[in-house]
Curated annotation (Swiss-Prot):
The modification N-acetylmethionine is found at M1. Residues 6-48 form the CARD domain. PANTHER family: TRANSCRIPTIONAL REGULATOR QRICH1, ZINC FINGER MYM-TYPE PROTEIN. Transcriptional regulator that acts as a mediator of the integrated stress response (ISR) through transcriptional control of protein homeostasis under conditions of ER stress. Controls the outcome of the unfolded protein response (UPR) which is an ER-stress response pathway. ER stress induces QRICH1 translation by a ribosome translation re-initiation mechanism in response to EIF2S1/eIF-2-alpha phosphorylation, and stress-induced QRICH1 regulates a transcriptional program associated with protein translation, protein secretion-mediated proteotoxicity and cell death during the terminal UPR. The modification Phosphoserine is found at S345, S464. Changing S736N: In VERBRAS; uncertain significance. Residues 139-164, 218-240, 419-441 are annotated as: Disordered. The CARD domain may be involved in the regulation of caspase activity in the context of programmed cell death. This is Transcriptional regulator QRICH1. Its main location: nucleus.
Length: 776
C-alpha cells in the first residue's frame, strides 16, 4: 500500500514512519543504509518492507511479514484449525527435487442462492532447475459476473527426496443473489458465511518419518453483521488476517484477488530451510487492526533442565458479539518442540460447517458459532528434547490470565511425542460443553499429562468448599447450626418417647430450646456436649474438628452479643463440654492435600480476640493469652515444654536506641532448650526466644499482658523457678488485686488449653516455619 504521508510530513517523521514497516531482523541493515546512502535507503527498503520474508533463527527458518497494527509494528497471526488426515484425490502432491512447479487454482461458482469459492493449490518440487509458478483463477457461474485470469510468476527449484502433500482451501457462504467482484463484496448482502480451510503438507524424512500439516478453520460473522445495514467491507486472500468491522481496502501482493465477507484467518508456520523459496504468500501487505484486542492467557512451561517455553495465547475479536468470536494464536519457541495441537470452540463440532442460512444456524445444533483447531508440525532438524521422550517427568505449568472484554472459550494445547502419529479427535473429544466457561491448558508428553484450569476473567472464581475460609466469626452461623441440631435431636427424642412407656411421675419430655439465649446453663452444657459428636453439616457429614471449634466460637460470640456472660470454654459450669471438646481436638493435625499443600485451619487468632478468648477479660482468658503467646513465639508445642516454663526463666529486657536514648524497646526472652546447653557455656542472643512489644495495639501487646499477669499474681510466687501458669480464682472482681492462687494449674487443664491453641491457624504456620528452618 502506498504511503500517503510523504508529501505532508517532515523527512524525520517520514523516516520514523518508514522504520515501523522494516522487519526487526533488517532494522540494523536499514539504519546502516540510512547513515551511508541517505534518502536512497528509503527507496531500497520501500519494496522489501512490506513483502513476506523467510529468515533463519536457530534451527528453523521463520516466515515473517511486517504488519502495521494501530500505528506500531506487530506480527499478528491468528490460528486456523489443523488436523492430520490421509491424502485424498483432491490433494495434489509436491515432489521436492531441484525443479519446482507450483500451481494455484481458484474456482468461484455462483448461483442466485449460493456462492462457493474453492482454492486448490498444488506444489510439486523437484531439485535440479527452475520452472515457473502458475496461478490460475477460474470463476464459473450461472450469470456472467466474473472473469478467470491467469498469472505466471517465476520460481526457483531444487532437488530433494521429500514430498509436500496437500492443500485445499474451501470457502463457502450462502447469500442472496448478488454479483461477485474481483475487488470486494459488501458485507451487508451476506448475512452468514462459512469458511473451511484445509492445508496438508508432508515431507518424508531420512528415517522414514512422515510429518503432515493440515489446517481447518471456520468462522462466522457476529450478529451485529447480520442485523446492521452497513458494517463494512473486508478483503481476504488465501491466508487472510483479522480486521475490525469497518470498511477498508487492502492491496494484494498479486494482481488477481477475490473478496468475500467475513472474519478471515491467518497463520504463521515454521518453514524448513529446503523449502524457503517454495512458499507462496497471498497475505495482504498492510492492515489496520483495533489494538483493543489483546492477550487472554500465557502458559509457561519449564523443563527440569531449566528450559522455558512460553505459550502466549492471543484472543482477538471484532466489535461484534463477544460470545460469537474466538480466534486464538499459539506461538511456540522453535528450539524444543515437534508438534503443537491447538483447539478451541464454545460448542461441539468436528467437521466444521457453518450454514449461512439464519434458520439453520438457529435450529441446527450441529452448527457452531466458532470452531478452530490447529496442528503445527515443524520439519526442522531439532526435534523434541531427549528428556521428554520417556514421558515420565514432571512439567510445572504456570498460567496467567489478563481480563478482557470478551468471553473466553475452552482452549487446549497438546504437546505430543515426536514418535507418535497425531490422530484427529472425535467431536466429543475436541469440544467441551457450551456451558463450560473455563480455559484449559493441557500439556501431554507421552504418558504424562499436566492440566491447569483457568477460570474465565469475567466471572468470579468459585473456590472449592475447603478453601472457603472465613476471616471473622459469624454468630448467625453458630445459631443456625444449633437450631438444626436442636430440631433433629428433639425429633429423635419424640420418636423414642413414642416407643417407650411413660415414666412414673409423668416427667416432662426433654426438649432443647432452639433459642440459645433462653437455654438454661445445664441444658446448654449438655447440648454442647452432644453437638461435639452429633452435629452434621448440610450433606449429613460430621464437621471437621477445626470447623466444629469455629462453630462453638460463633456460639460464644452470639452469647456475648446478646447479654449472656457465659464463657463456655472456661466457666466451671461447662467443664464437661470442654472435656468432650478436648477429645475431639486432641488428635488434630494440619490437613495435607495429596499434592503436599497444607490446608489452613478455619480458626484464626483474630476470631479468639473477637469472642474474648484472648485478652485480659478474666483470669482464665489472661492465662490462655499468655499460653498462646508462649506457644507462638517461644514455640512451646507440648504440655511438658509449658510445664518447664517458670517465672525465673522468663526475662524482661529493655533496650535503648543508640541514636535516640529516649527510644526504648522492651521484650521478654526465654532461653531455648535450657537443658542442652553445657554448664559454663556462654549464652548468646540466638539462644533466646523473644516476644516483642506491639505499640500499635496495647491491648494485644505481649509485654503489657505479661506485666498485667505479674501484677495480678501473688507476690510470693513471682520468683519461683518451677511454675508459670497459676490457677485462676473462681470468683474475682475486675478490680481485685489478686486473680490467681499460688497453686499451678493441673496438667489436664493445661492440656485442654493447649489443644485449643494448637488448632489456631497462626500457631500452625509458626510451627511449620520453625520446622522448615530447622530442617535446613
Amino acid at each position: 500500500m502506498n504511503n500517503s504521508l510523504e508529501n505532508t510530513i517532515s523527512f524525520e517523521e517520514y523516516i520514523r514512519v518508514k522504520a515501523r514497516s522494516v522487519p526487526q531482523h533488517r532494522m540494523k541493515e536499514f539504519l546502516d543504509s540510512l547513515a551511508s546512502k541517505g534518502p536512497e535507503a528509503l527507496q531500497e527498503f520501500q519494496q522489501t518492507a512490506t513483502t513476506t520474508m523467510v529468515y533463519q533463527q536457530g534451527g528453523n527458518c521463520i516466515y515473517t511479514d511486517s504488519t502495521e497494527v494501530a500505528g506500531s509494528l506487530l506480527e499478528l497471526a491468528c490460528p486456523v484449525t489443523t488436523s492430520v488426515q490421509p491424502q485424498t484425490q483432491q490433494e495434489q502432491q509436491i515432489q521436492v527435487q531441484q525443479p519446482q512447479q507450483v500451481q494455484v487454482q481458484v474456482q468461484v461458482q455462483q448461483s442466485p442462492q449460493q456462492v462457493s469459492a474453492q482454492l486448490s493449490p498444488q506444489l510439486t518440487v523437484h531439485q535440479p532447475t527452475e520452472q515457473p509458478i502458475q496461478v490460475q483463477v477460474q470463476i464459473q457461474g450461472q450469470a456472467p459476473q466474473s472473469a478467470a485470469p491467469s498469472i505466471q510468476t517465476p520460481s526457483l527449484q531444487s532437488p530433494s527426496p521429500s514430498q509436500l502433500q496437500a492443500a485445499q482451501i474451501q470457502v463457502q457462504h450462502v447469500q442472496a443473489a448478488q454479483q461477485i467482484q474481483a475487488a470486494e463484496i459488501p458485507e451487508e448482502h451476506i448475512p452468514h458465511q462459512q469458511i473451511q480451510a484445509q492445508l496438508v503438507a508432508g515431507q518424508s524424512l531420512a528415517g522414514g518419518q512422515q510429518i503432515q500439516i493440515q489446517t481447518v478453520g471456520a468462522l462466522s460473522p457476529p450478529p451485529s453483521q447480520q442485523g446492521s445495514p452497513r458494517e463494512g467491507e473486508r478483503r481476504v486472500g488465501t491466508a487472510s488476517v483479522l480486521q475490525p468491522v469497518k470498511k477498508r481496502k487492502v492491496d494484494m501482493p498479486i494482481t488477481v484477488s477475490y473478496a468475500i465477507s467475513g472474519q478471515p484467518v491467518a497463520t504463521v508456520l515454521a518453514i524448513p530451510q529446503g523449502q524457503q523459496q517454495s512458499y507462496v504468500s497471498l497475505r495482504p501487505d498492510l492492515l489496520t487492526v483495533d489494538s483493543a484486542h489483546l492477550y487472554s492467557a500465557t502458559g509457561t512451561i519449564t523443563s527440569p533442565t531449566g528450559e522455558t517455553w512460553t505459550i502466549p495465547v492471543y484472543s482477538a475479536q471484532p466489535r461484534g458479539d463477544p460470545q460469537q468470536q474466538s480466534i486464538t494464536h499459539i506461538a511456540i519457541p522453535q528450539e524444543a518442540y515437534n508438534a503443537v495441537h491447538v483447539s478451541g470452540s464454545p460448542t461441539a463440532l468436528a467437521a466444521v460447517k457453518l450454514e449461512d442460512d439464519k434458520e439453520k444456524m438457529v435450529g441446527t445444533t450441529s452448527v457452531v458459532k466458532n470452531s478452530h483447531e490447529e496442528v503445527v508440525q515443524t520439519l526442522a532438524n531439532s526435534l523434541f528434547p531427549a528428556q521428554f521422550m520417556n514421558g515420565n517427568i514432571h512439567i510445572p505449568v504456570a498460567v496467567q490470565a489478563v481480563a478482557g472484554t470478551y468471553q473466553n472459550t475452552a482452549q487446549t494445547v497438546h504437546i505430543w511425542d515426536p514418535q507418535q502419529q497425531p490422530q484427529q479427535q472425535t467431536p466429543q473429544e475436541q469440544t467441551p460443553p457450551p456451558q463450560q466457561q473455563q480455559q484449559q491448558l493441557q500439556v501431554t508428553c507421552s504418558a504424562q499429562t499436566v492440566q491447569v484450569a483457568e477460570v474465565e476473567p469475567q466471572s468470579q472464581p468459585q473456590p472449592s468448599p475447603e478453601l472457603l475460609l472465613p476471616n471473622s466469626l459469624k454468630p448467625e452461623e453458630g445459631l443456625e447450626v444449633w437450631k438444626n441440631w436442636a430440631q433433629t435431636k428433639n425429633a429423635e427424642l419424640e420418636k423414642d418417647a413414642q416407643n417407650r412407656l411413660a415414666p412414673i411421675g409423668r416427667r416432662q419430655l426433654l426438649r432443647f430450646q432452639e433459642d440459645l439465649i433462653s437455654s438454661a446453663v445445664a441444658e446448654l452444657n449438655y447440648g454442647l456436649c452432644l453437638m461435639t459428636r452429633e452435629a452434621r453439616n448440610g450433606e449429613g457429614e460430621p464437621y471437621d474438628p477445626d470447623v466444629l471449634y469455629y462453630i462453638f466460637l460463633c456460639i460464644q460470640k452470639y452469647l456475648f452479643e446478646n447479654g449472656r456472660v457465659d464463657d463456655i470454654f472456661s466457666d466451671l459450669y461447662y467443664v464437661r463440654f470442654t472435656e468432650w471438646l478436648h477429645e475431639v481436638l486432641k488428635d488434630v493435625q494440619p490437613r495435607v492435600t495429596p499434592l503436599g499443600y497444607v490446608l489452613p485451619s478455619h480458626v484464626t487468632e483474630e476470631m479468639l480476640w473477637e469472642c474474648k478468648q484472648l485478652g485480659a477479660h478474666s483470669p482464665s482468658t489472661l492465662l490462655t493469652t499468655l499460653m498462646f503467646f508462649n506457644t507462638k513465639y517461644f514455640l512451646l508445642k507440648t504440655v511438658d515444654q509449658h510445664m518447664k516454663l517458670a517465672f525465673s526463666k522468663v526475662l524482661r529486657q529493655t533496650k535503648k536506641n543508640p541514636s535516640n536514648p529516649k527510644d526504648k524497646s522492651t521484650s521478654i526472652r526465654y532461653l531455648k532448650a535450657l537443658g542442652i546447653h553445657q554448664t559454663g557455656q556462654k549464652v548468646t542472643d540466638d539462644m533466646y526466644a523473644e516476644q516483642t512489644e506491639n505499640p500499635e495495639n496495647p491491648l494485644r501487646c505481649p509485654i503489657k499482658l505479661y506485666d498485667f499477669y505479674l501484677f495480678k499474681c501473688p507476690q510470693s510466687v513471682k520468683g519461683r523457678n518451677d511454675t508459670f501458669y497459676l490457677t485462676p480464682e473462681p470468683v474475682v472482681a475486675p478490680n481485685s488485686p489478686i486473680w490467681y492462687s499460688v497453686q499451678p494449674i493441673s496438667r489436664e487443664q493445661m492440656g485442654q488449653m493447649l489443644t485449643r491453641i494448637l488448632v489456631i491457624r497462626e500457631i500452625q504456620e509458626a510451627i511449620a516455619v520453625a520446622n522448615a528452618s530447622t530442617m535446613h
